[in-house]
Amino acid sequence: MPSFDTPEPISVTAHVEAGSIQFTAGDGPATVVDVRPRDPKRDQDVRTAGQTGVTYAGGTLTVRTPKLGLLGRTGTVDVTVGLPVGSHAEVTGAWLQVFGEGRLGEVRVKTSSGDVRLDTTGPLKLTASHGSITVDRVEGAAEIATSSGSVRVGLVDGPAVLKNSHGTTSVEEARGDLRVSGANGDILIARAEGSVTATAANGTLRVAEVSRGTVQLETSYGAIEVGVREGTAAWLDVSSDSGQVRNTLSASKAPEESADTVKIRARTRFGNIDVRRARP
């Protein structure tokens, strides 16, 4: 079990062809790496674990499983990395699950298949072809994309771009401008402090609370629902080709210059549109 003295945050570059990698960020003065075969009785897993390289130099930890054999076979390993809070991580893999506990710094992940679950990160760039993605908190900008699977983000404290071809996408709170796009799947945003652009070919679009900026929502098949924060004036441009448009906001005079305003543009071909005050 390799261990390195690391009193300050470090950078990690890891490539795991198949298996999992878990980062645990803590206050300890050392970085500890453990590589284990997924199945201790499977020779390929044991061989891959034994051939996985772990090195540390110049503030960078490198973890790399061996290249695929001539027959394209590889073993499955589980890697754990205990490291200082605020450390950066760049992870790639084919069939790989990625987990993060504690507060990491900037994180970049690219996998072909596998779930990703992270507690807190700095700026985040995450790409997965297949797999569910869960991130509790992003302290900075976020770029997340998956071809198939759910995407759930707690708080994003910066601008964010989320792309999900097939699956539900949900955001609890976005403090910067937010762009979400999908082909098939609902888009659910609980609270947006900035502008929002959300588009889907087939899915419901719901933004529970907006307070300022521009909100642009468009879906071909699905309902649209927008909640406007109390005290915020709203300019509306909404239409449905086949469905009802319901606006329960009370008409008012032009807002004062100091008042928060939001411009809402919503379009759906098949589905209802509801605009109301946000529920407390």
Which residues does each PLM region occupy?
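Intrinsically disordered, low-complexity terminal regions
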Residues: 1-280
